[in-house]
């Protein structure tokens, strides 16, 4: 299970660099606890352009991650966190989503089967990364930037479904929040 960090697991606060400002999104802890109980590895993938822009450094990024893990608790295990510190101008050679590079690296590092994985994100770029990594299930959540990006996500999914040259082979699930996620989508028992 791949999840974006800001706007999915934690409240999106523009260029968050202070661990005292980290707040979990509703349903984040429960979802990760359910995944852990069922043996599903959880990988966080996150774009952090604030590093490239000089708003914060890798140490501040790590402190925010540490606070996230502390708030989630031991019952909500995270296998790894992959972060990209490039800005939008770094495309297409960076790990920055929509590149699938972070997902592909995690699959190799952790021996994950991407065809048995899903991604939950709040931005179109999250879902594009999942599609480019050939994940079969993508979920878009309205938290974070999700409300603003939902129309673009729906348009993109429609275009992918009707494409003859690049049929994505994924299912898109639209969620209001992580509280609406149904573990049976993964074969998980809640």
Regions found by a protein language model. Name each.
Residues 1-43:
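Active-site neighborhood of HAD-like aspartate-dependent phosphohydrolases
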